């Protein structure tokens, strides 16, 4: 699997260039039939896996799925955390699910597809589990790129704000 030919700075810049004001909620742009199929697959991933934090998703993900976590979720030294293979990604979802008091709310602001790659700009909202009544609502902006292979998600590059915003 080849790496996405963008530096971290270029990927973040690309995410910032997609203007929020011009994008209606869940706006999707696809140039061909295969683009539309890729967008539909990524939308299903958000609806059926990310929002409910479902950990069984082999029907949507390639067995050799690679997920790169940049920003929040990255290694302590700031380098991307790379999860290789379905078991590693499932284990990560299990870990995330254990930290949240309620399902994650994901608002997709924009999806753009070209060929087998889909770019997504979104916001995650969730409640972290705390001790006692110390649960706090949080929000994070994310940009992600999804590579589709054989009708399944094969590679995810996820760029997430390292410092979430606290909601009241």
Task: List where the protein language model places each region.
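A short acidic/glycine-rich loop-to-helix N-cap element
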Residues: 31-33, 131-137, 164-168
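Short, surface-exposed coil-to-beta transition loops
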Residues: 104-107, 123, 137-143
């Amino acid at each position: 699997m080849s790496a996405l030919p963008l530096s971290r700075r270029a990927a973040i810049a690309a995410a910032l260039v997609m203007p929020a004001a011009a994008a209606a909620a869940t706006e999707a742009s696809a140039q061909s039939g295969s683009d539309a199929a890729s967008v539909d697959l990524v939308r299903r991933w958000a609806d059926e896996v990310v929002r409910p934090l479902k950990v069984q998703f082999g029907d949507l993900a390639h067995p050799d799925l690679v997920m790169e976590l940049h920003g929040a979720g990255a290694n302590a030294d700031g380098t991307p955390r790379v999860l290789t293979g379905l078991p590693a990604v499932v284990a990560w979802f299990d870990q995330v699910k254990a930290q949240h008091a309620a399902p994650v709310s994901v608002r997709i602001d924009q999806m753009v597809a070209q060929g087998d790659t889909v770019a997504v700009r979104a916001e995650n909202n969730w409640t972290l589990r705390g001790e006692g009544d110390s649960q706090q609502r949080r929000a994070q902006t994310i940009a992600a790129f999804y590579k589709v292979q054989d009708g399944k998600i094969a590679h995810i590059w996820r760029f997430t704000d390292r410092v979430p915003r606290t909601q009241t």
